[in-house]
Design a protein with these regions (language model features):
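N-terminal "arm"/small-domain region of PLP-dependent enzymes with the aminotransferase-like
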Residues: 2-165, 175, 483-488
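Conserved core segment of the aminotransferase class I/II
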Residues: 6-52, 64, 340-421
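Conserved core of the PLP fold type I
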Residues: 39, 125-300, 304, 310-345, ...
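Short, solvent-exposed loop/turn segments at secondary-structure junctions
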Residues: 104-108, 197, 220-222, 243, ...
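Preference for well-ordered, secondary-structure-rich cores of eukaryotic proteins
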Residues: 105, 109-113, 225-238, 244-255, ...
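PLP-dependent enzyme catalytic core of the Aspartate aminotransferase-like
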Residues: 113, 485, 497-546
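Conserved glycine-rich beta-strand-loop-beta hairpin in the small C-terminal domain of fold type I
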Residues: 416-431, 442-461
Length: 546
């Protein structure tokens, strides 16, 4: 069948009159979700049981419009992929009385694991010390499903599964997505990934061909550029301000695109990290996201929304002597305080949102998920079935035990509020340290509103060896000088979207995620000491610079 004509996907360039659903007003309360779950039987939860996230949504979305189709943007590779025929046979395993001589699923009697015990926090006592003292132990047995003790067990989780992930955890993820984002079209779906880097790799294969250019922020996640390069893809950087990507700049680039001069067809894919952007820490406001979305509609761009820092949004930093920032008083207040995601304003189904547990639970779990239209999720699942095969069952069982069976949506929101406050405290520590120790005549910054990163601008033209030394050489010398002083920050040039373009600004990225608070302050002191030495500045680290 031929793909739809261009008329079939003509963009609506003004969404200002479109009423978008409020995730809170459109959903039930988080503590009522479990009561709205559909009844299921054991076959839904068995080994390699296929599932569709549409069956796990707790509201009807039939009143919403369907997503547009994206045949004209999808790669030839994605269009011809047929999926995994052996996995498709798993749908018959739930038939009562069936004796399977088909799939090579090892018998669980040969799994050398009988029980899994995990000590986890109780609600309101989330710290490491509190968990050690008052945490509870949750247990997963080998045959809990057969014994009606639980719907997920070792025998199921440790065997082969579907590329979409287990039905058990996928249900929880779908409910969470509906609660927080509530996409404004009817045929949205979720499917699991093994993290956003893998999801990006698969998305690029789905939407591009060698020689294409992708749009992104001018400074972007280095691994995204490195993922794209071996596929024959290049990245064009869009100018930024403190709110991230500038929609007018993107519009101008696309409106004046010259295929011959650029050596590539007009881009049709935007990769963006809208919240706590890596590396700059910039967060797009709600208005900025709507403006970006309208430009994407105007030029028919598909959007890859990579948003691992979404729940690490913070209140503004107001200075060292300001009153303590209080946590949100309710789940409703917390969710309303979050900037709406691009997914939540996506009336066309032109967003693939990539979520992850890496920044809020554990990066080693290698579990994330993708939300997009049914068409795109189906293609993603067929790819996963012949590549990643879905996240590790051990990790899925652990997270399901914690999130679904122990915490539920209510306690998970409590945990997210806790994490938000912890990162706010860390952000404030690094801000105060910068104010105390960094020479402001050559270093400047804006406090981040989300995420894990602090972006420091260095006035390299004030370096005593400029202009006899290049910006690249000065950056290298500062980098090595900081290491000599016992600290490590990342070079801003590592995050260029396009290394071939000339750059006239010098940045370094610091993180407040890893080191203890007292070490963060000491690290910034050493950074300030190194910068002073490199620029030949007088003054000691310990006095605030005016």
């Amino acid at each position: 069948m031929a793909p739809p004509s261009a008329i079939a996907v003509e963009a609506v360039t003004d969404t200002s009159g479109v009423t978008l659903p409020d995730p809170l007003s459109a959903s039930v309360k988080s503590n009522e979700i479990y009561g709205r779950r559909r009844k299921t039987d054991k076959s839904q939860w068995g080994v390699a049981a296929p599932s569709d996230s549409v069956n796990f949504r707790y509201h009807s979305h039939d009143h919403k419009p369907k997503a547009k189709r994206w045949d004209h943007h999808v790669s030839h590779e994605a269009l011809i992929r047929k999926g995994n025929s052996l996995k498709q046979a798993a749908k018959y395993l739930g038939k009562p009385g069936l004796i399977s001589l088909g799939g090579g699923l090892p018998s669980s009697e040969y799994f050398p694991f009988a029980e899994l015990n995990l000590k986890v926090p109780t609600v309101g006592h989330f710290s490491e010390s509190e968990t050690k003292e008052s945490g509870i132990t949750i247990t997963a047995g080998k045959h809990d499903l057969a014994q009606d003790k639980s719907i997920f067990d070792i025998a199921t989780a440790f065997n082969y599964g579907q590329g979409s992930g287990s039905a058990q955890l996928l249900r929880w993820i779908t409910e969470h997505t509906e609660l927080v984002h509530n996409p404004p079209y009817s045929d949205w779906r979720c499917t699991m990934s093994i993290g956003s880097t893998s999801a990006l790799d698969m998305a690029l294969r789905m939407f591009t061909r060698p020689g294409d250019l992708i749009l992104s922020e001018e400074y972007t996640f280095a691994t995204a550029v490195e993922t794209a390069a071996p596929m024959g893809l290049r990245v064009t950087g869009i100018s930024m301000d403190e709110q991230g990507l500038l929609p007018d700049s993107m519009d101008h680039i696309l409106a004046t695109w010259d295929v011959k001069a650029r050596g590539a067809r007009k881009p049709h894919l935007l990769y963006t990290v809208p919240t706590g952007q890596n590396p700059t820490g910039a967060t797009q406001s709600a208005d900025r996201r709507r403006e970006i979305y309208r430009v994407c509609q105007k030029h028919d761009l598909y959007i890859l929304e990579d948003d691992p820092y979404y729940f690490l949004q913070m209140q503004p930093y107001t200075g060292p002597n300001s009153p303590d920032i209080l946590p949100p008083s309710s789940h409703s207040e917390f969710l309303k305080s979050l900037v709406p995601s691009l997914l939540s304003i996506d009336v066309d189904g032109r967003v693939m949102r990539m979520d992850s547990f890496s920044k809020v639970l554990s990066p080693g779990s290698r579990i994330g998920w993708v939300t997009a239209s049914e068409q795109i999720v189906h293609m993603y699942q067929m790819h996963a079935d012949v590549s990643t095969q879905g996240p590790a069952g051990m990790a899925q069982l652990i997270l399901w035990k914690l999130l679904d069976e122990h915490w539920g949506h209510v306690a998970y929101l409590d945990w997210l509020i806790h994490i938000r406050m912890e990162y706010t405290r860390r952000r404030d520590v690094i801000m105060q340290a910068c104010e105390k120790y960094l020479p402001k005549e050559v270093v400047s910054w804006k406090p981040p509103m989300a995420g894990m990163f602090h972006w420091l601008r260095i006035e390299f033209r004030q370096h005593p060896d400029y202009p006899s030394k290049s910006i690249e050489t000065i950056e290298e010398e500062i980098f090595m000088r900081v290491i000599e002083h016992g600290a490590l920050v990342m070079r801003g040039s590592w995050f260029y979207a396009n290394n071939e373009e000339e750059h006239d600004t010098l940045f370094f990225r610091a993180t407040y995620a890893a080191a203890p608070a007292e070490k963060i302050e000491e690290g910034i002191r050493r950074l300030g000491e190194a910068v002073r030495a490199e620029f030949g500045l007088k003054g000691s680290n310990g006095a605030t610079n005016g």
